[in-house]
């Protein structure tokens, strides 16, 4: 496969040092692992392509990031309608979702929206979405 033009120097170096690496083979193997996990009841979610802080990035950056996830990860996991936001952030601090970012994420198929932080969890069920705060169980 032709190397993308946007590879940084570290990736180019790694690929040069591993001439046996085959992206298509790696993708096929990853898809098999994902399917085996799904067969056991696992669900997959987006955490964004680039671990983005959705409350701080522009709509355009969110769209570009989401497109990368949809093109590169969805084919491996069979798609998902769940997004778990990075950095304990959320789309809004308002009680109900609205706005361009929500409408965009909804338009590309997301129905379940979760943040991850150390505050008390919550659940919000609306006609157009399910929103849940989730407890961060990472150990620092």
Identify what each model region corresponds to:
Residues 43-51:
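Histidine-centered catalytic micro-motifs
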